[in-house]
């Protein structure tokens, strides 16, 4: 009985020791993505609702914390980067969540977002990781889009 307990303690000690071997700055983004990769929002400047539009969090990013996220680029249908005044309205928060205020002035259209992910030792840009579709308010309501907050 004592040998069994001693053996379990030794195995537990080895297990805890091996956890210390994680390389600081480890970052893997090969499987990164969003389950729903399209965020549909309304172009409705008259909306009284102040809850921002939000995407879900990114999945498949593995690494040592802290892991940071920022918008690397926002591109229009033709692949050109949009003006800074438009891109500045797309914020990336916490775990890679895209957030756009209800009172945004982003023109109607389809946009592709590149996301920069980095930590202490590594940095990756994930091109075209998400799509943002800005529709006239009536079309967004008719398509059944969800406004997440």
Regions found by a protein language model. Give the residues of each.
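Sec-dependent signal peptide recognition
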Residues: 2-9
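C-terminal motif of bacterial Sec signal peptides marking the signal peptidase cleavage site
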Residues: 15-18
């Amino acid at each position: 009985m004592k040998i069994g307990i001693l053996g379990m303690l030794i195995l537990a000690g080895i297990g805890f020791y091996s956890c210390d071997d994680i390389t600081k700055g480890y970052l893997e983004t090969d499987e990164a993505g969003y389950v729903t990769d399209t965020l549909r929002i309304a172009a409705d400047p008259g909306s009284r609702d102040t809850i921002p539009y939000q995407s879900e969090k990114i999945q498949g990013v593995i690494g040592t914390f802290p892991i940071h996220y920022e918008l690397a680029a926002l591109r229009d249908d033709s692949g050109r980067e949009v003006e800074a005044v438009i891109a500045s309205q797309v914020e990336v928060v916490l775990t890679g969540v895209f957030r756009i205020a209800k009172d945004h002035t982003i023109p109607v259209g389809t946009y592709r977002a590149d996301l920069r992910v980095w930590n202490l030792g590594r940095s990756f840009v994930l091109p075209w990781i998400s799509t943002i579709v800005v529709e006239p308010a009536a079309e967004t309501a008719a398509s059944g889009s969800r406004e997440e907050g």
